[in-house]
Amino acid sequence: MGVGGGGGGGGGEAAAAVAVEGDEAGKGRRWWRVKVKLSTVAVVAWVLASAALWAGLHWRFRRAALHKAEEALVCMCEERARMLQDQFAVSVNHVHALAILVATFHYDKHPPALDQDTFAVYAARTSFERPLLSGVAYAQRVVHADRESFERQQGWIIKTMKHEPSPAQDEYAPVIYSQETISYIEGLDVMSGEEDRENILRARATGKAVLTRPFRLMSNHLGVVLTFPVYLVDLPNDTAVEDRVAATAGYLGGAFDVESLVENLLRQLAGNQELVVNVYDVTNHSNPLVMYGSEVPLGIPSPSHTYTLDFGDPLRKHQMVCRYRNKLHVSWSAITTPSGVFVICMLVGYIIYAAWSRYDNVKEDCRKMEALKKRAEAADIAKSQFLATVSHEIRTPMNGVLGMLDMLLDTELKSTQRDYAQTAQVCGKALISLINEVLDRAKIEAGKIDLESVPFDLRSILDDVISLFSSKSREKGIELAVYVSERVPEILLGDPGRFRQIITNLVGNSIKFTERGHIFVQVHLADHSNLATEAKIEPVVNGMNGHKDEAIAIPTSGSHNTLSGFEAADSRNNWENFKLLLSYEKNEMPYESDSDKVTLVVSVEDTGIGIPLHAQGRVFTPFMQADSSTSRNYGGTGIGLSISKCLVEIMGGQINFVSRPLVGSTFTFTAVLRRCDKNAISDSKTVALHPLPSSFKGLSALLVDKRPVRATVTKYHLQRLGITSEVVGTIDPTFGVLSGRNGSSLTSIGKKQPCMLLIESDSWGPQMDVSLHARLQEMKQSDRIHVLPKVFLLSAAESDKVKKIHAVDSVIPKPLKASALAACLFQALGITQPSHEKRDDSGSLHGRDGSGSLHGLLLGKNILVVDDNKVNLRVAAGTLKKYGAKVECVESGKDALSLLQVPHKFDLCLMDIQMPEMDGFEATRQIRAMEGKANEQADDSESGSEIAAKTAKWHLPILAMTADVIQATHEECTKCGMDGYVSKPFEEKQLFQAVQKFLGPCVSS
């Protein structure tokens, strides 16, 4: 019912969680739609703003480029206009100079010194000074009264510009001197034309040069005629018009080729290809006349520049208009710069958008992660509850089975019945072990494993692990050995259970896959070890020659200097390296470190089948094995190594391996533990520390072993018992060593004769059964030895050959461990074991006063057992009664409350956790509440201090009985007021450790 109810509650919570999640999902979708709309609007607005910025910058840069082009146009146009004016002024000055020449040599000389030929020659020779004039001529002023005499004097009649006789006029201006280039105008009256007449009259009235309107010259170029008055005398600038007319002698004129003038000018300047230059006569603004350039109207498209020219004639107006030949193109800067800014804006916008999107995504992810976290926490709680329930519900019936089998084995059984019961017990323990492994993996995944920190004896733990596999190793005939460096502290602080679990998993795997050779467990300090602590997981294939598994030859025994003579997977694990390590540890001074941390390097080496190359990458993957045949042939689930790796990492270490198919494997891991001071050891009651017997101190032994690694391991175990030893390789030098002759020396045991002779079984020859006994008797009779040494045979296998040997006092079975070796030596040497060093059946030492015995703790104690399972009640009651306790059982928490009303008779309560109606947690809370109330009443009571002192001590030790191995359950036990817990089924050692705190003699007293 409890499980079903829990499932219903879990379903309701799941439905509520789904509903909340649905609401959150709906809100999330609505927010997503709003966010998409806002993002779209923001993106469009940013693009439009960037485009507007591009347009503004483009307009500004284009205007700047146009303004710069206009300024350049103004500069170039004004430069050309000034140069044109300057050159025109120079030409006018030359005409003026020629007019002065005529006035000087024609009118001031009598007779005149100037004639046509002279004028023509002079004009031709000085024409280089007037490159812009196509020709010059001088016309004399002739009044009508003087016409006739003038014509007689010149020898020709005055003609009009049309070469017709000039009609009668007030005055005439016939050309009398001309440059040869325009000699065709000689005798023509330049005043016969209306415009020419006006220009001549204006010139003599102002005294300045005047210009005609542009016309086509004989060269087909556009040009103008410059007219300059010639006076008989020099006149001041303010001379009246009438005086100027009266003083006028004639007129000097020249034809200007304006097109040639401008062309020559433009050729002298750079940039002409870019400009179009036009020169206009704008005297009549409504009808401008082109003087140079094409006939383009003045309304020229921008940009253009107009410059007013001053040729010295105040009446006529001239302008120069400049414009670019080609249409101005948009400058690259007006395109590239705004485009670059636009790209930058878009990139910035993209970055902002990406950052904002990232922020939104992160925010959304955080929201989802928060929701997932809540779901994960809920799932974690559900998983913990599920694991607790499964652990309890699966282990409870199995514990009942194992408990009943224990009780059955305590009864009188036939041999066949006992064998059946023992077989069932082994199978049940194997199933419990498998369940524990699966639950351990689940606890690791749930993060529910916390390490203990209690003092423990590492060497004792290794001895216990070796004991577990001793029978299996003897059946297979393989060497199983342990060596712990003397530098490793005897007592360490850590989690002994988890350390034992790692070693057990690794040794168990080695036992499973090893059929010959050895399994060697070594423990060294990391500071002293140069072994494979950092070995990488990489395949080693037949000496790295690339052959596959089936190409690897099986190594033969005796060819390698290892524990058994078989080759090891890690080539560094040989006698040479082992000897160097031993020498280093022996010679090094004790190292005192400020840190209390101790880093151990533990290696488990085997000569088994190794790990195939294709499977080495998934060795630590849960439930994975090399192939499907592995489980069929060797059994197992493939979870042990995965759990070991996780535990090693939780302990702050690393695990690696080196494996070679058909050679073997070496697993190496590090573990970080702490040193333990003597006070912590003496005060601690958590772990029972079992000291080894001291009865063998001072004894010496001689060891016959041809394998130095194996001999070192044997010396290690003898040394633990205080026995010094010497090693010889074969049996022959043994007799010399025993007698101290033949140059033999006992380096390790001094001059003292060994009292025992230990011989390895593979050093025992076929005739030694007779010869050894005879030789020893002979040596005793000849007084070479005084006492016959006890002869022990060391054997790793149970064989008929060993059983038939009669010349030995005892056979010491392997694997060696100190306690078993001590027991064998006690019996063979006839040494009486002191009572304080004897152990009871449970493995606990009997104290001198018997306080260490579980039987002594429980004898006569009243214990209440609370469990809803009748089988468990029977098992618990039977176990406790076996140790002399008085047991009373109830099936519910309510019944327990009624029996535990203060005052009561019970010394201890064992409480199941999961029970219907009222579980163990709630029952414990109510018991503690009752005790607290009773203690308060006792404190307030006025009945006397003695009664108050007695009743104030009401605190019944309550221990949880649980098949649940989840850490959260243990924490809940402490939180509700329980004093500890014991696992079901009861294990004698653990039960002793749990109850001695409350029922020990120091407590009772």
From Swiss-Prot:
It catalyses: ATP + protein L-histidine = ADP + protein N-phospho-L-histidine. The modification Phosphohistidine is found at H392. Residues 110-321 form the CHASE domain. One of its GO terms (cellular component) is nucleus. It is a multi-pass membrane protein. GO terms for biological process: cytokinin-activated signaling pathway; protein phosphorylation. Disruption phenotype: Semi-dwarf, chlorina, late heading and low fertility phenotypes. GO terms for molecular function: cytokine binding; phosphorelay sensor kinase activity; protein histidine kinase activity. It is an enzyme of class 2 (transferase). It holds the Pfam family Receiver_CRE1. Induction: By isopentenyladenine (iP), cis-zeatin (cZ) and dihydrozeatin (DHZ). Induced by cytokinin in roots. Activation probably requires a transfer of a phosphate group between a His in the transmitter domain and an Asp of the receiver domain. InterPro entries: 2C_system_His_kinase, CHASE_dom, CHASE_sf, CheY-like_superfamily, HATPase_C_sf, His_kinase_dom, HisK_dim/P_dom, HisK_dim/P_sf. Its EC number is 2.7.13.3. The keyword DNA-binding does not apply. The modification 4-aspartylphosphate is found at D912. Keywords: Cell membrane, Cytokinin signaling pathway, Kinase, Membrane, Phosphoprotein, Repeat, Transferase, Transmembrane, Transmembrane helix, Two-component regulatory system. Histidine-containing phosphotransfer domain (HPt) contains an active histidine that mediates the phosphotransfer. This is Probable histidine kinase 4. It comes from Oryza sativa subsp. japonica (Rice).
